[in-house]
């Protein structure tokens, strides 16, 4: 009897192994980090175990590529387990989000593109609709009776099922949120892929949780534009109830990626004709909830409606504000700042005063507007999107009017930035289109032929992660981007901003969820890497508090010494990040002892 039982178990193990080999021949799962992209026909070089490392209150991502080496497969389900850690502690599967990577076409290359035209994974189609909490159903058409009109249900874009043809790949993206209260240690689980024909394959997952915690909101200041353009993508009227619902979902998506969302105007105090503010209780309550829930750390005060200067500087009144309007505007700024101070929001307050003043007359306008704000509220900061040196030495110096300078990456000059910082100003940085250093750059001859990390689909994903590293090098404390939802040719098939040249993904980080049946955004791989860069900055600041800037910069030097020299190798970023984490852990132990 014992021998028969042993033989039965032995045969079962052999058959199980045989089935696994057969499945393994039909499905191969390969792990990639969040900075890699795999083409549909590209040969894969990756691991067969997922290994990631994370602080608490951080989201860390990985990719699993599903490949079909021998025959076409039809994947019908992907599931992930809880991750089990020390003494039975868990990172629950509810804290893990899965997405299927959709491919978009780059038809015409961006200027100075680093990668060729073709298909690139970028939109992340969620397995679960974040609004309904249910899977996105594939589109189907049914007809109850011949001759009757068909009934359509489901959507064109969904996560599963999906086909993988022989020799091709399909990547799955996973976001793992590590809660604040989990014990440190290694958490193990698995991701399993099921295909038709009764075949499946799994890949082990190991998440190492480090003993430090990231703050809720972004330390690195930022401004990423407004969401007015989503009305176009969803074919709705601005300020309609549906628009407000969708706008709020975009705001939530920004917050989830450590970007301060634009505060909807309908939540702000109402401006009266005399410049005074009316605090509407319902708005105020909702605004408090918005700031708390979305971890908002900056507050842009809208420009006073009474102090708008003409965009055309050919008009004789291009820099004139009447005494009456000046008085109203100053009352507006005083009352708005008091409102923020009364609620503890004044620390991150600023006025986005002027964008790219490219004429002498624009400099004069900046001076007039800044003086008006500072006379009303000396401590209220004025932001101007401009480099930290004059375009022309004959132009007026706007330094007294500006508190936050925001140069293009290629316009940055370290020496002049240090001068502004020494005077008590802040410096942010921003990118747009493809612009090299201007002729009036102090080191033009040295940097004129160099390129900073432009933001487009046809470039390595690392260009979205590295700016916060370089910003830290220069003591730059903020990041600005002109839009995340600009008008593109066609968002899902040709996401290019034409100006008139193609800027693939320029000003466009969120895909409209319409083809997925989502009344909100579909996230891009690019914004995930931007989030990782914002999280990296939190590491920098934690280490700086435990040691000093020099210690942090020594590690960053290996990745990004300046705006024209920076790594594009994912493993170099991960190695530097781990060095920072190990330094934090070492110094934290010393600090606690």
Language-model segments: residues:
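Bacterial N-terminal signal peptides that target proteins for export
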Residues: 1-8
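Bacterial N-terminal signal peptides
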Residues: 8-17
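Sec/Tat signal peptide C-region and signal peptidase I cleavage site
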Residues: 18-23
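Beta-sheet-dominated interaction scaffolds and their linkers
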Residues: 24-69
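Short strand-edge motifs at loop-to-beta-strand transitions and within beta-strands
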Residues: 48-50, 60-62, 94, 160, ...
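Aromatic-lined carbohydrate-binding surfaces of glycoside hydrolases
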Residues: 67, 81-84, 108, 112-116, ...
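Short, hydrophobic/aromatic beta-strand segments
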Residues: 72-80, 185
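Substrate-binding groove of N-acetylhexosamine-processing glycoside hydrolases
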Residues: 338-353, 368-593
């Amino acid at each position: 009897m014992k021998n028969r039982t042993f033989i039965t178990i032995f045969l079962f193990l052999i058959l199980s192994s045989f089935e696994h080999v057969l499945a393994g021949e039909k499905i191969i799962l390969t792990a990639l980090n969040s900075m890699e992209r795999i083409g549909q026909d590209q040969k894969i070089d990756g691991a067969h175990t997922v290994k990631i490392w994370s602080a608490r209150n951080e989201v860390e991502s990985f990719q699993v590529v599903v490949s079909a080496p021998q025959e076409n497969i039809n994947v019908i389900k992907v599931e992930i387990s809880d991750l089990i850690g020390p003494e039975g502690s868990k990172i629950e599967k509810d804290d893990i989000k899965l997405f299927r990577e959709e491919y978009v076409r780059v038809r015409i290359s961006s200027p100075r593109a680093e990668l060729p035209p073709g298909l690139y994974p970028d939109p992340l189609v969620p397995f679960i609709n974040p609004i309904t909490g249910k899977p996105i159903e594939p589109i189907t058409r049914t007809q109850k009776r011949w001759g009757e009109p068909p009934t359509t249900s489901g959507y064109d874009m969904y996560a599963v099922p999906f086909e993988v043809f022989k020799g091709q790949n399909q990547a799955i993206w996973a976001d793992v949120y590590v809660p604040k209260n989990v014990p440190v240690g290694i958490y193990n689980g698995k991701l399993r892929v099921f295909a038709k024909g009764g075949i499946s394959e799994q890949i082990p997952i190991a998440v190492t949780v480090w003993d430090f915690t990231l703050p809720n909101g972004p330390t690195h200041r930022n401004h990423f534009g407004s969401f007015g353009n989503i009305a176009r993508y969803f074919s709705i009227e601005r300020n309609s109830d549906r628009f407000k619902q969708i706008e709020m979902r975009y705001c939530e998506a920004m917050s989830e990626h450590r970007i301060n969302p634009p505060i909807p105007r309908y939540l702000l105090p109402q401006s009266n004709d005399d410049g005074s503010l009316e605090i509407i209780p319902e708005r105020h309550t909702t605004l408090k909830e918005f700031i708390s829930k979305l971890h908002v750390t900056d507050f842009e005060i809208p420009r006073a409606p009474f102090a708008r200067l003409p965009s055309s500087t050919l008009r004789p009144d291009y820099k004139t504000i009447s005494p009456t309007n000046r008085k109203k505007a100053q009352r507006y700024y005083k009352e708005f700042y008091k409102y923020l101070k009364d609620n503890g929001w004044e620390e991150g307050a600023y006025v986005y005063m002027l964008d790219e003043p490219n004429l002498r007359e624009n400099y004069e306008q900046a001076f007039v507007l800044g003086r008006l704000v500072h006379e009303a509220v000396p401590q209220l900061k004025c932001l101007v999107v401009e480099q930290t040196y004059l375009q022309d030495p004959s132009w007026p110096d706007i330094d007294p009017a500006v508190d936050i300078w925001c140069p293009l990456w290629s316009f940055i000059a370290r020496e002049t930035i240090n001068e502004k910082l020494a005077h008590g100003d802040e410096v942010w940085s921003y990118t747009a289109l493809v612009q090299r250093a201007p002729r009036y750059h102090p080191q033009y001859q040295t940097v004129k032929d160099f390129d900073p990390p432009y933001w487009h689909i046809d470039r390595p994903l690392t260009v979205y992660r590295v700016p916060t590293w370089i910003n830290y090098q220069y003591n730059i404390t903020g990041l600005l981007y002109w839009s995340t939802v600009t008008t593109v040719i066609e968002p899902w098939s040709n996401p290019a901003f034409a100006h008139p040249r193609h800027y693939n993904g320029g000003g466009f980080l969120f895909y409209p969820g319409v083809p997925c049946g989502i009344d909100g955004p579909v996230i891009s791989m690019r914004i995930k890497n931007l989030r990782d860069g914002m999280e990296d900055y939190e590491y920098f600041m934690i280490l700086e508090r435990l040691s000093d800037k020099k210690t942090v910069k020594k590690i960053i030097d290996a990745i990004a010494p300046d705006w024209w020299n920076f790594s594009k190798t994912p493993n170099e970023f991960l190695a530097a990040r781990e060095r920072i984490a190990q330094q934090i852990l070492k110094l934290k132990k010393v600090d606690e002892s």
